[in-house]
């Protein structure tokens, strides 16, 4: 499945929730879902009855779009989560949260996960002192993500760091803004993931 390249705000309206795909715009009145809180398209404002399968599918699509994961990748994460000890749905969210690009976003180095992924791929970060370019790396407790010296004057990164106070930093992460580095204090717990996600619906979908 190809990566979606259309309007990001259209996806938020389709999933009827804020996916925070457009950075700081999502925190303003310009957010599309605040202005037009109904699905896109000619029949977007019409009433529709959604089947159980449709509800499960929409939840999967919502989570996949939040983290910017392709379908095959997402299924791979689910299969891995299913093999781990614990609750499959929660394991899935933990794996997604521990992606390096998500950590860069959560710490405030980028205004969106898409931007964070680009920064990682372009070699702007080191992980535990080593340059990294793979967004899907799974971080662990104690890992330190640092912006490389040559990247510290990039305007969009500094703007994101200044604005991170608005959305906050998860308790399981720690940011030293002055040193352009952040640390993974501990692995995330379910209560740390505050987005409106019903992961059990995804488990039900893939269990069919």
Swiss-Prot record:
CDD domains: S4. InterPro entries: Ribosomal_uS4, Ribosomal_uS4_bac-type, Ribosomal_uS4_N, S4_RNA-bd, S4_RNA-bd_sf. One of its GO terms (biological process) is ribosomal small subunit biogenesis. PROSITE patterns: S4. Residues 98-158 form the S4 RNA-binding domain. The keyword Lyase does not apply. Disulfide bonds: none annotated. GO terms for molecular function: rRNA binding; structural constituent of ribosome. One of its GO terms (cellular component) is small ribosomal subunit. The keyword Signal does not apply. Keywords: Ribonucleoprotein, Ribosomal protein, RNA-binding, rRNA-binding. It holds the Pfam family S4. Belongs to the universal ribosomal protein uS4 family. Part of the 30S ribosomal subunit. Contacts protein S5. The interaction surface between S4 and S5 is involved in control of translational fidelity. One of the primary rRNA binding proteins, it binds directly to 16S rRNA where it nucleates assembly of the body of the 30S subunit. This is Small ribosomal subunit protein uS4. It comes from Geotalea uraniireducens (strain Rf4). The lineage of its organism: Bacteria, Pseudomonadati, Thermodesulfobacteriota, Desulfuromonadia, Geobacterales.
